[in-house]
Amino acid sequence: MFIETDYFGKIEINEAETITFVSEIPGFPDSKTFVLIPYGEDLPFWSLQSIEEQACAFVVTNPFWHKSDYAFELSDGAKDQLGIEEAEHVSVYSIVTLREPFESSTLNLKAPIVIETKERRGKQVILDDAYPARYPLGGTKAEVR
């Protein structure tokens, strides 16, 4: 299957690798199906690209690489929506807000993207935990407000 993207142009994707979101990412009601496209083999970033909307894409990364003590408990409702039965079938990503200079970029730890990897269902979860929506990408600077 071919899709058009703003960042990568026209690319071929494996339809079996698409992720269906069980609820919309806030502000993007027309995008329900996404695919993760790596920015490069040596880079820890992906584009979470909408299949339905060419211009809808989010830079994401694994939050545990940037904050090793990041932890949260999913609600039973979220687990049910995603069909999560085992933790080994879950991937978590954080949306990155890119800034100039790059070192000023931040992660949204408050609202991670949770993906059940067997059935490929996704959801952006808003956490009650005290995590910031703008955590410094390097994790060493003071929190950006």
Swiss-Prot record:
Sections of the chain in a coiled coil: none
Keywords: Bacterial flagellum biogenesis, Chaperone, Cytoplasm, Translation regulation
UniProt GO BP: bacterial-type flagellum assembly; regulation of translation
Cell location: Cytoplasm
Annotated GO CC locations: cytoplasm
Pfam families hit by this protein: FliW (PF02623)
Chain segments annotated as transmembrane: none
Keyword Chaperone found: yes
Stored InterPro entries: Flagellar_assembly_factor_FliW, Flagellar_assmbl_FliW_dom_sf
Top-rank taxon, per record: Bacteria
Predominant place of localization: cytoplasm
Family classification: Belongs to the FliW family.
Entry function: Acts as an anti-CsrA protein, binds CsrA and prevents it from repressing translation of its target genes, one of which is flagellin. Binds to flagellin and participates in the assembly of the flagellum.
UniProt cross-references to PANTHER family, sorted A to Z: FLAGELLAR ASSEMBLY FACTOR FLIW (PTHR39190:SF1)
Assembly, per entry: Interacts with translational regulator CsrA and flagellin(s).
Name recorded for this polypeptide: Flagellar assembly factor FliW
